[in-house]
Amino acid sequence: MRRLLSVLFAGALLGIPVNSNAQVASDYPNRSIRLIVGFGPGGATDTFARIFSGPLSKALGQTVFVENVAGASGYIGWRTVATSSPDGYTLMMAENALVIRPGFKDIKPQFDPSTEFTPVAFAATSPLAICVANTVPANNMKELIALSHSSTKKLTFASAGVTSVSQLIWDVVRDGADIDAIDVPYRGGGPAMADLIAGHVDLTLPSSQVAKPLLDTKRIKCLAVTGKTRSPALPDVPTLEEAGIKHADVDLRFWFAVFGPKGLPAVVTAKLQKAIQAALQEPQLKERLKSLDITPDYAAGPELHARVVSDVKNWGAFIEAKGLKGQ
């Protein structure tokens, strides 16, 4: 008893709430939660995060609000989460860009996504679509390839950033298809798509979820999708394989996953995982995701961590083999 009183007294003198972490974790969440997206509004990750935040809020019993923290191809948003308090009130919805950036050894500072975050849960996947402006005189990949080599005006490709998913997957596609185009990096997929619609750039590579409503309203053209099978959302658009395009053995889909700061308490992580799994099973969300060609694909922290480690290795090997630079 004397020892316990001494500990309590010492804690009070130092201003340390005794067992505060356990108390915070036990009633988590008791206020709203920030879900950081490292890119601007309108891109694939932002779109999924906003659709998903409603069912996740319902499952957690607290509001989950999306906050866009764009810059440096996602890095500013990721760093915001990495340096936040590990209490579960600042999370991030990340995508493949998180595992691509470490492969660019010329970019500083370097970071390791497998050790600097708490992997909470893998959530979903979505194929990408090769889209061109209506002003581009090409209606299939064969015509696009020919145009890229014959046009007096160089084609321009708009990416979500130098080290973004769209840029790297485009590098894989370009390598396999031998397409000649100038890269134009943007601060997110939303601005890139806006300029494609306006005809300021010729090509971009959004997720099929972003492409579908624009294709349906004939504001853009889609020439191919990156999945191994045709997209249910874009059934008339061929796959790269059907278009005769071979590519390196890397996964050419967007994936979406939830991470927290390093050191997130296990009880908080478990509550989040349970809520994420429940949210992904909500019938209305499943129908909404299906209409956008997003496939729920829940996996808990250990599996997500293994995926991060594997993807960092595979993308790093591709980047090194092709001599790609991030700056």
Task: Please provide the spans of the model-predicted regions.
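A ligand-binding cleft/hinge motif common to bilobed small-molecule-binding domains
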Residues: 97-106, 172-176, 203-237, 316
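Hinge/capping helix and adjacent helix->loop/strand transition within the periplasmic-binding protein
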Residues: 83-89, 102-191, 240-245, 255-288
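N-terminal (or domain-start) structured segment
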Residues: 22-115, 154, 162, 178-207, ...
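HAMP domain helices
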Residues: 250-251
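Extracytoplasmic/secreted proteins, especially bacterial periplasmic and envelope-associated proteins
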Residues: 47, 51, 55, 59, ...
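An extracytoplasmic/periplasmic, membrane-proximal ligand-sensing/linker region
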Residues: 30-32, 175-179, 242, 266-327
